Curated annotation (Swiss-Prot):
The gene is thap1. The keyword Transcription applies. Keywords: Cell cycle, Coiled coil, DNA-binding, Metal-binding, Nucleus, Transcription, Transcription regulation, Zinc, Zinc-finger. A zinc finger (THAP-type) spans 5-57. It comes from Xenopus tropicalis (Western clawed frog). Pfam families: THAP. Residues 139-194 form a coiled coil. This is THAP domain-containing protein 1. The keyword Zinc applies.
Amino acid sequence: MVQSCSAYGCKNRYDKDKPISFHKFPLKRPLLCRKWEAAVRRADFKPTKYSSICSDHFTADCFKRECNNKLLKDNAVPTIFAHTEIKKKSGKAVKKEQLPAEPEPVPSVPEVDPAIGLLLPPLYTPSHIAVICDHNYTVEDTVHQRRRIQQLEEQVDKLRKKLKIANQKCRRQERSLEKLEREVSEYREAKGSGYVIFPGNYYEVLNENEYKELAPEITYKEIIL
């Protein structure tokens, strides 16, 4: 189904070669949707999930700048509507299509809520509609999504690099730990054997176990070199 503009007299239809975007009625936001309906000014018009307004009916400040005028800001309301000129088939005078006359404003009477006994806030009419453009609420293309995906992919790459560096550090620490364990083991093995050097003309070097066999009454630690 080809998208077309629901504005009165607008003949814009979706064309990928034209810089015109289409924005669906905010049906999930009743208050804002009623503002759109009032701005369109079409009698007995009820928007559906397929109804949309083209970007020609929104002012420039209603769009997010970084999205090339394809993303509306929050609470944006269409305000640009021109009278449609219809030419007669006979080629005579061109008449302007008259829009339905607006009803006379009815003075609002404050209402009292019987439950709490307080005045209710006044109802706002189309004349009170104000264009408030703050945040995006609709997405007509995938520019924002693609940009977000690209950012996430960059973050994943950075985390992978950090993980690789951390793994390399862990492997180096494991090798250092294994080296220290070998040194400690070798030191303990070497510490189990001792040597005694006798003074004077005795230059024989005896193993501790051999010395104990020769002089069992003297301990190895009592020998003064």
